[in-house]
Amino acid sequence: MTIHTSRIIMSTDAFLTLTQWLSPGFPVGAYAYSHGLEQVIDCGDMRDAKALQDWVEDILEHGSGTSDGILLAASYKALPEDVSRIDAIARAFASSAERVTETVDQGAAFAKAVDAIWATDLGQLCYPVAVGRAACAQGLPLDLTLEIYTHAFAANLVSAAVRLVPLGQTEGQAVLAALAPLIRQVARRCHDAGIDDLTTACMALDIAAMHHETQYSKVFRT
């Protein structure tokens, strides 16, 4: 019996590259951003794991979890001359000055590291746009890229809440495990979406992100 391993090896290589790019250890400074959750917690609107799960579910389904995925997929599929337009849309979709900083600074840090190691030339792009272009340049599968990106996004929100609420590490991991089916669902939806499908409906979090800009005492940059 002949065993074909080429697809398995290629898939493993893609998985390892993406987990490196989107791990907490990759130098994009993700640990410094709470996406507005610091203000939510400071106001007393998130006190336990159940509230955390509710907030992150909304963000994934109706906020940046979906819009970032759509932007990533659009940049992955785009012709080179269309990338700057997608990046401009990504900046416009950031709902506060700090959110712009969050996506622009992480995108710049990501591009700097990937360009240095994988010999790409990504330029100055917002984070999801940079990830999409890098994945395309390296021939990484879009579906896997979206799943791991969305998981990393959710994991960073959970990590911020674990530190701020505070919650136990096990509680945080239980929330992340419970979010796995939704993460896969959002990634699949973004895979087939186009730039015209961009929408957001996380007004409470957007307002919290705006208030965070003038919050007196804060740990996170956003």
UniProtKB/Swiss-Prot annotation:
It is found in: Cytoplasm. InterPro entries: UreF, UreF_sf. It comes from the Bacteria. GO terms for cellular component: cytoplasm. The keyword Transmembrane helix does not apply. The keyword Hydrolase does not apply. GO terms for molecular function: nickel cation binding. UreD, UreF and UreG form a complex that acts as a GTP-hydrolysis-dependent molecular chaperone, activating the urease apoprotein by helping to assemble the nickel containing metallocenter of UreC. The UreE protein probably delivers the nickel. Required for maturation of urease via the functional incorporation of the urease nickel metallocenter. Belongs to the UreF family. This is Urease accessory protein UreF. It comes from Roseobacter denitrificans (strain ATCC 33942 / OCh 114) (Erythrobacter sp. (strain OCh 114)).
